[in-house]
């Protein structure tokens, strides 16, 4: 974990985006305002464990302000939907992909600008992460579920 200065330009952009979220989606902003930002190299983008929002400095630097707004909304949705609590024994990578498919369609519907490469597929509209996991498992070779254990931020 890296502690960052309030003078940090990337932290400033995240805080500004979080404030903008307050006017666009106040309920989600309330969730996001309660989560501290922590810099990490364990993810290439941003992530949440339900208690913090982890960010990769390079991702923040290359993202537009509108993309940061969308990603913060995305992370707030993860928390609101309890994705950090519902994974159970599902492989963490598979779970994150399924949860992202479910959430990104909501972000898109809110007319926010997701970064290039965001996981979007209309076939998953209206489905839960659990339902998407089942569909994704049908498309891939059998893989055993992972035992439930704490995972580092992604």
Ranges and model annotations:
Residues 1-70, 76-154:
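Short, functionally important secondary-structure microenvironments
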């Amino acid at each position: 974990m890296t502690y960052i200065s309030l003078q940090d330009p990337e932290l400033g952009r995240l805080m500004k985006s979080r404030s903008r979220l307050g006017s666009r989606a106040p309920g989600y902003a309330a969730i996001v305002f309660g989560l501290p930002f922590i810099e990490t190299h364990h993810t290439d983008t941003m992530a949440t464990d339900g208690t913090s929002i982890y960010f990769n400095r390079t991702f923040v630097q290359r993202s537009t302000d509108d993309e940061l707004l969308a990603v913060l909304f995305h992370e707030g949705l993860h928390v609101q939907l309890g994705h950090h609590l519902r994974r159970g024994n599902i492989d963490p990578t598979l779970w994150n992909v399924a949860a992202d498919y479910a959430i990104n369609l909501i972000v898109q519907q809110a007319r926010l600008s997701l970064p290039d490469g965001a996981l979007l597929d209309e076939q998953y509209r209206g489905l839960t992460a659990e339902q998407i996991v089942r569909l994704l498992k049908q498309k891939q070779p059998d893989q055993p579920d992972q035992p439930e254990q704490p995972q580092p931020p992604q």
